[in-house]
């Protein structure tokens, strides 16, 4: 694997290996007074974010630093992109500056793929490119950390029924999770109003439903999504209140879930809209576990791309 641009870059076997790798990193760090491994010493990791981020950017930075990499942050507002430089010129500049890995977030779908095609393969000196979210397309490391969290909470993903609820249309998280969780043997159902489902969703390995209440009693997990108002130019539902009434996870709806079921959210959460504060803070919600797992999972991804299958503590 030269890059991680899409869930399509993974097989079921390689995805499971990454989940296992992340847990090995977690174990390798346990009990260390200084959380530092020499794994990526001498490697340069650059985060290149053209959209705002808290969880993804911070976890990649922490992941790189915990493996002793030199981590450099590049933001659109402080780079020459703000002066009109093209994305290609920026990417080639970062390659020439010695990047071993480029972690890219961009509002345009396909941007990470394009950067990977420009900067070349690692075997000809090009950096590994990791898609940290491209438009409404994909967010593969988010899906991996969600799968890790589900495996830890449920014991296994095979055969589990998992709902992805909310703004499917604008969600790269929904697409990557649908592909990965289905690959790992889960039964995935998308729950959303028709206006928030993408064209072509019938080709996804999922089923579709419009009633959240009808689905909740049969679920093992539910992944709640934020309504991405910043990507909307028109009215996709009558009002926030009506959306919350029909698709928000309230305390009453939480009680409809089986006792073992877990609630996930990729963040940021809009409390009071897609999830009630009491639900967000419930022990049945794994939001902070997702953040912790995000660091270990991104350590695993960087390790696999830059080093390969060796001793994680080495």
Curated annotation (Swiss-Prot):
L-aspartate binds at residues 83, 172, 226. InterPro entries: Asp/Orn_carbamoyltranf_P-bd, Asp/Orn_carbamoylTrfase, Asp/Orn_carbamoylTrfase_sf, Asp_carbamoyltransf, Asp_carbamoyltransf_Asp/Orn-bd. PROSITE patterns: CARBAMOYLTRANSFERASE. Carbamoyl phosphate binds at residues 55-56, 105, 139, 142, 267-268. GO terms for biological process: 'de novo' pyrimidine nucleobase biosynthetic process; 'de novo' UMP biosynthetic process; amino acid metabolic process. Keywords: Pyrimidine biosynthesis, Transferase. Pfam families: OTCace, OTCace_N. It comes from the Bacteria. The keyword Secreted does not apply. Pathway: Pyrimidine metabolism; UMP biosynthesis via de novo pathway; (S)-dihydroorotate from bicarbonate: step 2/3. Belongs to the aspartate/ornithine carbamoyltransferase superfamily. ATCase family. NCBIfam families: asp_carb_tr, PRK00856.1. Heterododecamer (2C3:3R2) of six catalytic PyrB chains organized as two trimers (C3), and six regulatory PyrI chains organized as three dimers (R2). This is Aspartate carbamoyltransferase catalytic subunit. It comes from Rhodococcus opacus (strain B4).
């Amino acid at each position: 694997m030269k890059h991680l641009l899409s869930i399509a870059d993974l097989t079921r076997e390689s995805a499971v290996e990454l989940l296992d790798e992340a847990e090995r990193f977690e174990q390798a760090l346990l009990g260390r007074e200084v959380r530092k491994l020499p794994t990526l010493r001498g490697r340069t990791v650059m985060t290149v974010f053209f959209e705002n981020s808290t969880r993804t950017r911070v976890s990649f930075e922490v992941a790189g630093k915990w493996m002793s990499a030199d981590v450099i942050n590049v933001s659109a507002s402080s780079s020459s992109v703000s002066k009109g430089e093209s994305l290609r010129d920026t990417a080639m500049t970062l390659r020439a500056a010695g990047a071993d890995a480029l972690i890219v977030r961009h509002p345009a779908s396909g941007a990470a793929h394009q950067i990977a095609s420009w900067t070349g393969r690692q075997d000809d000196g090009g950096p590994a490119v990791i898609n940290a979210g491209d438009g409404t397309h994909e967010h593969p490391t988010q899906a991996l950390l969600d799968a890790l969290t589900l495996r830890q909470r449920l014991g296994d993903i095979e055969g589990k029924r998992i709902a992805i609820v909310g703004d499917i249309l604008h969600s790269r998280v929904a697409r990557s999770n649908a592909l990965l969780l289905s690959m790992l043997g889960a039964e995935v159902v998308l729950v959303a109003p028709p206006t928030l489902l993408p064209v072509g969703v019938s080709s996804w390995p999922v089923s579709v439903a419009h009633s959240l209440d009808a689905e909740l009693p049969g679920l093992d997990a539910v992944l709640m999504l934020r309504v991405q108002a910043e990507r909307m130019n028109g009215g996709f539902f009558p009002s926030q209140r009506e959306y919350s009434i029909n698709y928000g996870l309230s305390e009453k709806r939480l009680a409809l879930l089986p006792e073992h079921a877990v609630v996930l959210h990729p963040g940021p959460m809009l409390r009071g809209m897609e999830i009630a504060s009491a639900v967000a803070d419930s022990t049945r919600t794994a939001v902070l576990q997702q953040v912790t797992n995000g660091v270990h999972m991104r350590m695993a991804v960087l390790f696999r791309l830059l080093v390969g299958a060796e001793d994680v503590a080495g």
